[in-house]
């Protein structure tokens, strides 16, 4: 099953917007967090009036950083400056790690709960949303005979794919340990990166298939014997289930010279074993 009518979903949501806005007018204003300042420092805020201790941890600081509460129970602190990049972070409230409720940009992951903050540079990053033609992301579900369950895929198609007829090369891009099929787009921004590379003639138009790399719950370390077994299961599912689904529903070139596979962490190991 393929979810194509993204625009329809968005338009349907718009019908509900006036009602939701009306209801929100009676609510207290949200706490703005994070705020990226001009000097590339970041101000984090969290409303937690009943908490006794709140910290924040980021990848541009070392260790947990304490926040200070005001009279209304809003904890805040400013960290950095940080080098331009996209960083995960989370709050630790009385010892419990939580994502930032004021930030819709979430790091998709099975274990840790983190939000994302982008520190812009003087020049747009390769993953920035630029004024170029953009491709589409399609969320799909397929029946896995190998695992005997329904499994997700995220598939990128390049600009002009919907109106075209040409078959295209395909890259199978596998998620890392504890990551999901959404991590490559929501964190890696691979769709915007390829949009920009295609526009700059630095990459050919291609389709990217992003499967959920976890073949079993409780993923073992990549060095264990169980991990090698999991790599074999991934190879079987790729050949038996994923490739036939993709080749039946998308205009991909099915010969080995036009197929590639890559991955991060666990996904890198799965790619090498395929």
Predicted feature locations:
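N-terminal secretory signal peptides that target proteins for export/translocation
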Residues: 1-3
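Generic alpha-helix initiation/capping and coil-helix boundary signal
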Residues: 5-6, 176
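Bacterial N-terminal signal peptides
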Residues: 6-18
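Boundary at the C-terminal end of the N-terminal hydrophobic targeting segment
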Residues: 21-25
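Non-catalytic cap/lid and distal C-terminal segments of serine-dependent acyl enzymes
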Residues: 30, 36-55, 59-64, 69-274
